From Swiss-Prot:
Pfam families: UPF0102. CDD domains: PoNe_Nuclease. This is UPF0102 protein Clim_0016. Belongs to the UPF0102 family. SUPFAM superfamilies: Restriction endonuclease-like (SSF52980). It comes from the Bacteria. GO terms for molecular function: nucleic acid binding.
Amino acid sequence: MDHDPHSLGRQGELLAAEYLAGKGYRIIVRNYRHRRNEIDIIAFDGRTLCFIEVKTRGSLEKGHPVESVTPQKQKEIIKAARSYLLTLENREPDCRFDVIAILADAMDNDRIRSFTIEHFIDAFWEETG
């Protein structure tokens, strides 16, 4: 059964934010936008500023959720992160890029009833040089 991808994505982002808060992260911004680029969640893990991409799928039919964070998507997230850093007083905090993958194990009328969550810490980074 096909599910509304926007609803699934919104639910996944909420579940990810709850997961992070439960792990002691301090959520700063959700759905930060810079031009056409977006970062789903910006949060502090201790003193480390985390830019977090959330991917949610209703099945593995189209692959694991983390597989959709392509090199192009990573570049877009990095561009948005650079923009966000310009808004900070301390423009060079310790940063990292994480991915949270959520697989809906059970759905009921487009609502996630049970799920599996995987947190890929430091999943990618900006290449320098």
